[in-house]
Amino acid sequence: MSIAVGMVETLGFPAVVEAADAMVKAARVTLVGYEKIGSGRVTVIVRGDVSEVQASVSAGTDNVSRVNGGQVLSTHIIARPHENLEYVLPIRYTEAVEQFRESVNPQPLRRV
């Protein structure tokens, strides 16, 4: 299973909160962080299986319009990010989000 990175950049903090909420509710992904870029630009970052991240980014994008003045500025998915990115950019699973990662990715069922 490939662990993808999905990003949604919005104009305004309320819009990114709406996007993040929709993203984690719509698919089995883990919210790993957000970045305030300046001028009201905020990016939310999720990790998970490629298909789940795709569904998550789509849901986040669709829900931003629910916020008065909310605007999607950009979205992007990286299917298999190079491991070096995890040590330089804020896309790594941290101890603080590990509990949520485990609830999103439960142990597979064993066949009897």
UniProtKB/Swiss-Prot annotation:
What SMART domains does the database record attribute to this sequence?
Answer: BMC
- The residues covered by the BMC domain are 4-90
Q: Principal localization?
A: other
Question: Matching SUPFAM superfamilies, A to Z?
Answer: CcmK-like
- Is Iron set as a keyword in this record? no
GO cellular component terms attached to this protein's record: carboxysome
Q: Name one GO biological process term.
A: photosynthesis
Key words of the record: Bacterial microcompartment, Carbon dioxide fixation, Carboxysome, Photosynthesis
Instruction: Read off the Pfam families from this record.
Output: BMC
Single GO MF annotation = structural constituent of carboxysome shell
Q: InterPro entries per the record?
A: Bact_microcomp_CS, BMC_dom, BMC_shell, CcmK, CcmK-like_sf, CcmK/CsoS1_BMC
Cellular compartment(s): Carboxysome
Q: Which domain of life is it from?
A: Bacteria
Q: What is known of its domains?
A: The tight homohexamer forms a small pore which is positively charged.
| Assembly description | Homohexamer. Interacts with CcmN and CcmO in the carboxysome.
Relate the protein's function as given in its record: One of the shell proteins of the carboxysome, a polyhedral inclusion where RuBisCO (ribulose bisphosphate carboxylase, rbcL-rbcS) is sequestered. Assembles into hexamers which make sheets that form the facets of the polyhedral carboxysome. The hexamer central pore probably regulates metabolite flux.
Q: PANTHER family of this UniProt entry? A: CARBOXYSOME SHELL PROTEIN CCMK4, PROPANEDIOL UTILIZATION PROTEIN PDUA
The record's comment on protein family reads: Belongs to the bacterial microcompartments protein family. CcmK subfamily.
Tell me the protein's name: Carboxysome shell protein CcmK
